[in-house]
C-alpha cells in the first residue's frame, strides 16, 4: 500500500552509483572504532537542536528498553512478513561537520520477505508466484569496545541461522546540492531494520514513503555516532510501520523520513532470496515538483482572479443593461401618454375641420351678389348713366338772327365753357376707347373701364397762374382789335363797351362778342348800327381743327414763321415746344418806348401732331384776305407796319 506522504518514483539503479556506494561502505569497514568514540561527544552536542518528532503509531516502551536484546544488536528475527512490513529509510538532518551529503545503508542485511516483482520500489508490491521460506538471522558477535553511552554501533555482518544470508548491494543516490563540510568529521551512519509483522508471508508487502514537507532546503545528514534504529514492537498492525530513533534528544524540524522497503526476489539459479537494493531518495526531486506545484497554484490563483474579474464585469454590464432597460421603459410609457394626447387633439381638429367644411350656399350666394352689385354700382352703371346724360344733354342753341346790342355775360361764358369741357371729355373717352380697339384685344370686357392717362403731379396754383396768363393774353388781343376796328362808333357804343369791361373785371376771363357789320353800316353815321351775326362762319373751321374746350389754339395762316429746332432730346420725356407770339403790353408804364417788342412765350409739351386738310370755305373771310396777302408776299418784301398790327386776331367765345 502506497504511503500518502510521498509520490511514487521509478527505480532506476546505475552501476556507477553501486561502485561508489561499496567504496563508501569499505571506508566505514576499515575505519577504526576509536574514531567513533572520539567524535561521539561532538555529535552528541551537535544534535541537540534536531527534532525527530514523527506522527507514528504508539508502541510499547518495554520492547525498546536498553535491557532488551533489540538494543544490544541489530538483528532480524525470523518472523513472517506481512504485506505492510517495510524497511524505513530515514533522512538525517544536515550537519556542517559532515564529510559528504550522501546517505548510507548497511552492507549486509538478512531480511525475511516475500518475493516481489521489482517494478517499482516506491509502488505497491506484487504477490510472488512462489512461496518463500522463513529466514533466520544469527546474532552478530559484538566487541567489548563497540558499546557507547547512548547506543550501540552496528556490526558489519549479519548471519542467517538456517540459510546463508543475502547481501544486497545498496545504491547511493546523489542528494540535493552539496554543502561545504569539514573533511575531518566522519559521515553519519543510518541503520535501517525491517519490522516483523503478524501477517502471513503469502500476503503483499506495502511500501511506505514518508516525503519531507515542501520546504526549500538541503538534506540534513547525521554523523556517524548517531544511530537510528527501527525496531518492531510485539504487536503491530499491518497498515502502519513503527520508527524508533535513538542517539540523541535533538529534533528534526520540517523533515519527514522516507521509509522504503527492500523487496525480496527469488533467484532462479540457486533458489535463494535476494534482497533488492533500497534507494534513498533525496529532496532534490521534490524541489522540482514543488516548483511545478507552486506554478500550478499561481496559475489557479490567476485563473480565479480573472474569473472573478470577468464575473464582476459581467455583473456590472448586466446592471447597466437593467438600468438602461428601466429608462427605456419609462420613456416609452411617457411617449405613449404624449402620443395618446396628440391623437385626441388630432381627432378634435379633424372633427372641427369637418364641421367647418359644411357648405353654406345661402351665405356664399349673398356674398357673391353683394360683391357684384358693388362692382356694377361703382364702375359699370354710373359710367353708363353719365355717358347717357352727356349724350342726352342738348348743346348750346345758336342765337336767333335778330338785332341785339353788343354785350356779353359772365354766366353765359361759364355755361359755354362747361359745355365745351363736357363735350371734350366725352370725345376724349371715345378716343381712348377707339385707341384700345386698335390693340390686340378685339373685344372689350363688360366691366372693363379704361384707366385715366398717366399724368404727372401738377401744382394747382401753378396751373391757375398759367391759365390766367393765357386767357389774359388772348383777351388783350381781342380788346385791342376791337378798339382799332370801332374807332368810328358812337359814344353809346363806347359806354356799352366800357361797362362791359368793368363788369368783366371781376372774373379772370372776359370774352368779347365779335360782330361783323357790313360796309353800309360802317359808313352810316347813325347811332344805332345793325349787327349781322354769322354763327356758321366759324363752326366749320372748328370742326376741321377738332377743337377741344380745354386747349388753347394758336392758328396762323402766315408763312413767315421763324422755326428753331431742338439741339438735344431726352427719350424719357415728351418733346417740348416754346411759342413766342406778339403780345399786348399790360401796363404801359412798365415798358414805355419804341425800342422793345412785347412778345408772349408759351412753353408746352408736344402731345400729338397730325396733318389737317381744311376747306377754304371754312376759313373766316378776313383770314382769307390775310392769307392771300401773305402768300403773295411770302418770298417778297415783308409786310408793312400797319398790316402787322392786324395779323394776330382772336375769335370771340360767343361763336365757339
UniProtKB/Swiss-Prot annotation:
Covalent cross-link Glycyl lysine isopeptide (Lys-Gly) (interchain with G-Cter in ubiquitin) as placed by the record, residue numbers: 139
Record keywords: Activator, DNA-binding, Endoplasmic reticulum, Glycoprotein, Golgi apparatus, Isopeptide bond, Membrane, Nucleus, Signal-anchor, Transcription, Transcription regulation, Transmembrane, Transmembrane helix, Ubl conjugation, Unfolded protein response
Region (Disordered): 75-169, 391-429, 632-656
Region (Leucine-zipper): 335-342
Region ranges (Transcription activation): 1-137
Site, as annotated: Cleavage: 406-407
Post-translational modification: During unfolded protein response, a fragment of approximately 50 kDa containing the cytoplasmic transcription factor domain is released by proteolysis. The cleavage seems to be performed sequentially by site-1 (MBTPS1, S1P) and site-2 (MBTPS2, S2P) proteases.
Annotated ranges, domain bZIP: 293-356
Gene: Atf6
Name of the protein described by the UniProt record: Cyclic AMP-dependent transcription factor ATF-6 alpha
Major subcellular location class: endoplasmic reticulum
Amino acid at each position: 500500500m502506497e504511503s500518502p506522504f510521498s509520490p511514487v518514483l521509478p527505480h532506476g539503479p546505475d552501476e556507477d552509483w553501486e561502485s561508489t556506494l561499496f567504496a563508501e561502505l569499505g571506508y566505514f569497514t576499515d575505519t577504526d572504532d576509536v574514531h567513533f568514540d572520539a567524535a561521539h561527544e561532538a555529535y552528541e552536542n551537535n544534535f541537540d537542536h534536531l527534532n525527530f518528532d514523527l506522527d507514528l503509531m504508539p508502541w510499547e516502551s518495554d520492547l525498546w528498553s536498553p535491557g532488551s536484546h533489540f538494543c544490544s544488536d541489530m538483528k532480524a528475527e525470523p518472523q513472517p512478513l506481512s504485506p505492510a512490513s517495510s524497511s524505513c529509510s530515514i533522512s538525517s538532518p544536515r550537519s556542517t561537520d559532515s564529510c559528504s551529503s550522501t546517505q548510507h545503508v548497511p552492507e549486509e542485511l538478512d531480511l525475511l520477505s516475500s518475493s516481489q516483482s521489482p517494478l517499482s520500489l516506491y509502488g505497491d508490491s506484487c504477490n510472488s508466484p512462489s512461496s518463500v521460506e522463513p529466514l533466520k538471522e544469527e546474532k552478530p558477535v559484538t566487541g567489548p569496545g563497540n558499546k557507547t553511552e547512548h547506543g550501540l554501533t552496528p556490526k558489519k555482518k549479519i548471519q542467517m541461522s538456517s540459510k546463508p544470508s543475502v547481501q544486497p548491494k545498496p545504491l547511493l543516490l546523489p542528494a540535493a546540492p552539496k554543502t561545504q563540510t569539514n573533511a575531518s568529521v566522519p559521515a553519519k551512519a543510518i541503520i535501517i531494520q525491517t519490522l516483523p509483522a503478524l501477517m502471513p508471508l503469502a500476503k503483499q508487502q506495502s511500501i511506505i514513503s514518508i516525503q519531507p514537507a515542501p520546504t526549500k532546503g538541503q538534506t540534513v545528514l547525521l554523523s556517524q555516532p548517531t544511530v537510528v534504529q527501527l525496531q518492531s514492537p510485539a504487536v503491530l498492525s499491518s497498515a502502519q510501520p513503527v520508527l524508533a530513533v535513538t542517539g540523541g534528544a535533538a529534533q528534526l524540524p520540517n523533515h519527514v523520513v522516507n521509509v522504503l522497503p527492500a523487496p525480496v526476489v527469488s533467484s532462479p539459479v540457486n533458489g535463494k532470496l535476494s534482497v533488492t537494493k533500497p534507494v534513498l531518495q533525496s529532496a532534490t526531486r521534490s524541489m522540482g515538483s514543488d516548483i511545478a506545484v507552486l506554478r500550478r497554484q499561481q496559475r489557479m490563483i490567476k485563473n480565479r482572479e480573472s474569473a472573478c474579474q470577468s464575473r464582476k464585469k459581467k455583473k456590472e454590464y448586466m446592471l447597466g443593461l437593467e438600468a438602461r432597460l428601466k429608462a427605456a421603459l419609462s420613456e416609452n410609457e411617457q411617449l405613449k401618454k404624449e402620443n395618446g394626447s396628440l391623437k385626441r387633439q388630432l381627432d378634435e381638429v379633424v372633427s372641427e375641420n369637418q364641421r367647418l367644411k359644411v357648405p353654406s350656399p345661402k351665405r356664399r350666394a349673398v356674398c357673391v351678389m353683394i360683391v357684384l352689385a358693388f362692382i356694377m354700382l361703382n364702375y359699370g352703371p354710373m359710367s353708363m348713366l353719365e355717358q347717357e346724360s352727356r349724350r342726352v344733354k342738348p348743346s348750346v342753341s345758336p342765337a336767333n338772327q335778330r338785332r341785339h346790342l353788343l354785350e356779353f355775360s359772365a354766366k353765359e361764358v361759364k355755361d359755354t365753357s362747361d359745355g365745351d369741357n363736357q363735350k371734350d371729355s366725352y370725345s376724349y373717352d371715345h378716343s381712348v376707347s377707339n385707341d384700345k380697339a386698335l390693340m390686340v384685344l378685339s373685344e372689350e370686357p363688360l366691366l372693363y373701364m379704361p384707366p385715366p392717362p398717366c399724368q404727372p403731379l401738377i401744382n394747382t396754383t401753378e396751373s391757375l397762374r398759367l391759365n390766367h396768363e393765357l386767357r389774359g393774353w388772348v383777351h388783350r388781343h381781342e380788346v385791342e382789335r376791337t378798339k382799332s376796328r370801332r374807332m368810328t362808333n358812337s359814344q353809346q357804343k363806347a359806354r356799352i363797351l366800357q361797362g362791359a369791361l368793368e363788369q368783366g373785371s371781376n372774373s379772370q376771363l372776359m370774352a368779347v362778342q365779335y360782330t361783323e357789320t357790313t360796309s353800309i353800316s360802317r359808313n352810316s353815321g347813325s347811332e344805332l348800327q345793325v349787327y349781322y351775326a354769322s354763327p356758321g362762319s366759324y363752326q366749320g373751321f372748328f370742326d376741321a381743327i377738332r377743337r377741344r374746350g380745354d386747349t388753347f389754339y394758336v392758328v396762323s395762316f402766315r408763312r413767315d414763321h421763324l422755326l428753331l429746332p431742338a439741339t438735344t432730346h431726352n427719350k424719357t420725356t415728351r418733346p417740348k415746344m416754346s411759342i413766342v407770339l406778339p403780345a399786348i403790353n399790360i401796363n404801359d408804364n412798365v415798358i414805355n418806348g419804341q425800342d422793345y417788342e412785347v412778345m408772349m412765350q408759351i412753353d408746352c409739351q408736344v402731345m400729338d401732331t397730325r396733318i389737317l386738310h381744311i376747306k377754304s370755305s371754312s376759313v373766316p373771310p378776313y383770314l382769307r384776305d390775310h392769307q392771300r396777302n401773305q402768300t403773295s408776299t411770302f418770298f417778297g418784301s415783308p409786310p408793312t407796319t400797319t398790316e402787322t398790327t392786324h395779323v394776330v386776331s382772336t375769335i370771340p367765345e360767343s361763336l365757339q
